[in-house]
Amino acid sequence: MKIIEGNLSLKGDEKIAIINARFNHIITDRLVEGAKDAFLRHGGKEENLSLILVPGAFEIPFALKQACESKKFDGICCVGAVIRGSTPHFDYVAAETTKGIASVGLGANVPVSFGVLTTDTLEQAIERAGSKAGNKGFEAMLTVVEMLNLIQKIKA
């Protein structure tokens, strides 16, 4: 059986976008730094990395759709942070952001990763943005890198 699997190495000419929700920027700035770090560590060049800023997580799917349609990017890494509050707002934003990214991602012709934190507390978000639980922005970028490689191997 032939196994087709991506790896974590970039050629250096891949153009990648990070879409970042500014809301909860104390968390999302760390996710962006993690994503950028992963991109550079695995062979990407900073001049090939674009940062698209949106107001909040709910706006990520629309920006993602526009970025995919532009055909300027080989892959797109989505990051944000939705932290539960005392109202049901969290449930709506988290669910619709997730559905929107998944929907656009399935229709895209480029890899799209989901690095949007959905946590119950600020402490949980901090843990996932570079402290105890690693950096989910870094992990989301690794997903883009691996999927780029996988697509190239599938098409070869």
UniProtKB/Swiss-Prot annotation:
The record places the active site at: H89 (proton donor)
User: Which keywords annotate this record?
Assistant: Riboflavin biosynthesis, Transferase
Name a Pfam family for this protein.
DMRL_synthase
Q: Which SUPFAM superfamilies match?
A: Lumazine synthase
Q: In which pathway does it act?
A: Cofactor biosynthesis; riboflavin biosynthesis; riboflavin from 2-hydroxy-3-oxobutyl phosphate and 5-amino-6-(D-ribitylamino)uracil: step 1/2
Name a GO molecular-function annotation: 6,7-dimethyl-8-ribityllumazine synthase activity
**Residues the entry annotates as binding (2S)-2-hydroxy-3-oxobutyl phosphate:** S86, T87, R128
Picking any one GO biological process from the record gives: riboflavin biosynthetic process
Described function: Catalyzes the formation of 6,7-dimethyl-8-ribityllumazine by condensation of 5-amino-6-(D-ribitylamino)uracil with 3,4-dihydroxy-2-butanone 4-phosphate. This is the penultimate step in the biosynthesis of riboflavin.
Cited NCBIfam families = lumazine-synth, PRK00061.1-4
Protein's UniProt name: 6,7-dimethyl-8-ribityllumazine synthase
Organism of provenance: Campylobacter lari (strain RM2100 / D67 / ATCC BAA-1060)
